[in-house]
């Protein structure tokens, strides 16, 4: 799809590639960049777009081979295809008629400077270009730059070409000769730093384009954060261009060295292999797969017979003979007396070292049927009211009790797109199970989540037909789009497909699944489970498009022009939240989004992956939610000697599921509650070494109903840490909200919707984190289902 059609070599390590990417070529403006992946194991690397040809549908990238991923790219040839190209990303360069403008480019920074110089010249500016490099071979695109410049100066460190000297000397000569109104500088961070020191002295406004560490490139991970004017900014969404006089270059340089040891080791291994081969090295052999819950179940579980057809159970009601007979087979007191099932778990001493072995092992047939027999099949089931997607819980539970396991799965899928997912990660104890009638007698509720997982897993592992999981599709109605493939988007897609719509899901990342893939570790939610649910949607008719950012690659207006009658925005979590305390941008401090994305989506802990994994001996995770538990438990599995959760309230107020806290503690996680970070202490290299903590006490309840934490004056302590993972929530993804004119926004940048999930733009509906600011999987799914129902009604009314 992203085929290389031209390659040029400027120097031993600098290459130009022209790549087919028609949508990006059409949308690209000066200043934009893309994220590129060479192969399935490749790192996501940011590259600024040098040129674009809308007619040919191509973009031009200039690359310097410095690490494994860029060396892999350098070894690709015309005709080869890149695995992924995502963009255009970032903000376009603000172009005005400034007057006299100096464009200063160093090394490969000349490539992204070219379209800026072209745009400045077209806007009527006098453009003076200063190109700089260590030697002549690093002066690239000179002829192209000369065409758009009124004057061009070449500087080389060694004097091998042009004038001998640094880029700042060339700029200084221009400043001495005439008045300069603006400066644009792109190149190595050190170069830009000294250019800005010079121009600040002369009070010349200066824009710099920053190329920082990135993972996703859409703002979700926070790896690209920099300090600008004393505030934390995200290069991929707020930049890449900033006021150079406000940038903390020293901090940026420290952060860019975050993975230098890992990168040097990886490059050494790559070069060692390459020196002994005529072609780039093949990836190492796959390690033997760990035993998954699927292989264990398939090895020991047999398929019980289902004497009654699934259709009878699926289409029935509480008053059907089979359910009446089931209810009378045991007295209510007998059902209430059965103890709640305990699911088998991997032993803590084993699972704490297994990143991809699922902790909860599932129920056996006997366990599932016995647990299902605890359900009283209530006439007015509170559990259904507690379910955000309104699953007919008694119905599917009774199907399990009677041995109709396939029917149980079909009952689930009639209202839920992701039953195998929800059965694993949804907080049933706060939703359906919290409304169970068992609570009235003081006994434990029916294990609805365990049973939901059992039914979905059983159907997946014992398929009776190719379309067993595919719900019946309604009469063809129209064409709708979904932005994002997380739980809200998938739920919407499944529901609309059932109702007869042609559904296309646009996903920014290279994997479908959103937070289900990048955010939740496999020891809680195996990828195979998510992939099966996605495949079920594909088989039902849902189309998926990866590497496409609605609002960047393609606009809402363009979707409407292509015949999409409605758009559901489920773009999910955007910018990770940070506390804004001293030292927070130090090396070794990451957001949970970045940490989990590296490990889960990019498989950074694998020898096959080019993405470096953040590792620490003493890991501190700040926060008390499920994402914090996922992060701290992952850190243990990657070899941390100590893993500590720091939370400002008590354990009672923790939003994480009780089960997740229990599992974390069993695995050796330490909990330091009623403490809050106030400062990070670093070494001379800028790497975090300690967390300074303020001891807290609980005061009166706040708006959330939880008691407000208050600092205890003078109670300060320190905790050793060489890796800190900040997990204190997220802000909505800003790309779509900022890309749609006239779209009404809510508090903190969420999309404002009415009770029907409809925004101020009638064709645009929204749900999940982009509306709530933060939601569980099942709440997001509930939004998706509700939005689908309402959009269907709205579209039907429009058509009469």
Which residues are covered by each model-predicted region?
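Ferredoxin-reductase
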Residues: 1-80
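Glycine-rich dinucleotide-binding loop and its adjacent helix/turn
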Residues: 455-474, 532-552, 576-638, 745-760
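Feature captures the FAD/FMN-dependent oxidoreductase FAD-binding
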Residues: 474, 479-483, 531-581, 679-692, ...
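N-terminal Rossmann-like FAD-binding beta1-loop-alpha1 element of flavoenzymes
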Residues: 480-504, 629-636
């Amino acid at each position: 799809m992203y085929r290389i059609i031209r390659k040029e070599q400027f120097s031993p390590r600098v290459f130009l590639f022209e790549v087919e990417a028609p949508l990006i070529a059409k949308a690209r403006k000066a200043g934009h960049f893309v994220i590129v992946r060479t192969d399935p194991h490749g790192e996501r690397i940011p590259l600024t777009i040098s040129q674009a040809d809308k007619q040919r549908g191509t973009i031009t990238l200039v690359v310097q081979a410095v690490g494994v991923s860029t060396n892999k790219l350098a070894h690709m040839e015309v005709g080869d295809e890149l695995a992924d190209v995502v963009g255009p990303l970032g903000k376009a360069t603000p172009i005005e008629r400034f007057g006299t403008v100096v464009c200063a480019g160093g090394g490969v920074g000349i490539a992204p400077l070219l379209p800026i110089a072209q745009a400045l010249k077209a806007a009527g500016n006098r453009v003076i270009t200063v190109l700089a490099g260590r030697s002549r071979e690093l002066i690239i695109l000179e002829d192209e730059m000369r065409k758009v410049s009124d004057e061009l100066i070449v500087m080389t460190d060694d004097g091998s070409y042009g004038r001998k000297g640094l880029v700042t000397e060339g700029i200084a000569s221009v400043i001495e000769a005439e008045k300069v109104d603006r400066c644009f500088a792109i190149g190595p961070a050190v170069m830009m730093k000294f250019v800005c020191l010079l121009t600040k002295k002369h009070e010349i406004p200066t824009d710099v384009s920053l190329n920082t560490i990135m993972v996703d490139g859409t703002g979700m991970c926070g790896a690209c954060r920099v300090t600008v004017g004393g505030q934390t900014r995200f290069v991929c969404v707020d930049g890449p261009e900033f006021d150079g006089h406000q940038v903390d270059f020293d901090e940026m340089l420290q952060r860019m060295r975050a993975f230098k040891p890992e990168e040097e080791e990886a490059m050494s291994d790559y070069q060692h292999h390459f020196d002994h081969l005529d072609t780039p090295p093949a990836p190492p052999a796959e390690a033997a797969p760990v035993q998954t819950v699927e292989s264990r179940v398939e090895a020991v579980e047999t398929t019980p017979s289902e004497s009654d057809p699934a259709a009878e159970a699926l289409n029935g009601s509480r008053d059907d003979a089979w359910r009446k007979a089931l209810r009378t087979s045991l007295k209510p007191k007998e059902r209430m007396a059965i103890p709640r099932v305990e699911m088998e778990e991997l032993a803590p001493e084993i699972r704490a070292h297994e990143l991809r072995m699922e902790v909860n092992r599932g129920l056996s047939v006997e366990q599932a049927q016995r647990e299902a027999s605890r359900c009283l099949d209530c006439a007015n089931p509170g559990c259904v009211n507690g379910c955000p997607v309104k699953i007919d819980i008694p119905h599917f539970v009774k199907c399990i009790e009677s041995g109709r396991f396939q029917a149980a799965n079909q009952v689930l899928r009639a209202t839920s797109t992701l039953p195998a997912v929800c059965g694993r990660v949804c907080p049933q104890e706060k939703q359906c199970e919290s409304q169970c009638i068992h609570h009235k007698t003081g006994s434990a509720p029916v294990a609805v989540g365990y049973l939901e997982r059992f039914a979905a897993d059983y159907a997946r592992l014992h398929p009776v037909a190719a379309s067993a999981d595919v719900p019946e599709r309604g009469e063809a109605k129209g064409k709708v789009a979904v932005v994002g493939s997380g739980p809200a988007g998938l739920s919407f897609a499944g529901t609309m497909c059932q109702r007869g719509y042609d559904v296309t899901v646009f996903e920014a990342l290279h994997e479908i699944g959103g937070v289900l893939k990048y955010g939740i570790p496999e020891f809680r939610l195996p990828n195979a489970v998510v992939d099966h649910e996605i495949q079920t949607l594909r088989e039902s008719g849902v189309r998926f498009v990866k590497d496409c950012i609605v609002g960047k690659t393609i606009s809402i207006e363009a979707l409407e022009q292509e015949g999409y009658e409605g758009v559901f925005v489920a773009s999910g979590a955007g910018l990770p939240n940070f506390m804004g305390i001293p030292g927070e941008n130090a090396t070794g401090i990451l957001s949970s989004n970045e940490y989990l994305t590296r490990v889960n989506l990019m498989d950074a802990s694998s020898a096959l992956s080019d993405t470096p994994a953040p590792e620490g001996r003493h890991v501190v995770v700040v926060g008390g939610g499920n994402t914090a538990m996922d992060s701290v438990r992952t850190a243990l599995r990657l070899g941390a000697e100590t893993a500590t959760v720091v939370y400002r309230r008590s354990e009672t107020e923790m939003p994480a599921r009780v089960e997740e806290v229990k599992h974390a503690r069993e695995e050796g996680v330490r909990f330091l509650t009623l403490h809050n970070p106030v400062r990070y202490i670093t070494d001379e290299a800028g790497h975090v070494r300690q967390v300074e903590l303020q001891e807290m006490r609980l005061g009166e309840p706040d708006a959330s109903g939880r008691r407000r934490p208050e600092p205890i004056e003078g109670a300060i302590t320190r905790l050793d840490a060489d890796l800190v993972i900040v997990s204190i929530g997220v802000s909505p993804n800003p790309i779509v909200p900022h890309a749609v004119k006239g779209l009404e926004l809510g508090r903190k940048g969420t999309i404002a919707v009415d009770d029907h999930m409809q925004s101020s733009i009638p064709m645009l509906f929204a749900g999940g984190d982009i509306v709530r600011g933060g939601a569980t999987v099942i709440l997001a799914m509930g939004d998706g289902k509700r939005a689908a129902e309402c959009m269907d009604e709205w579209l039907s009314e429009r058509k009469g």
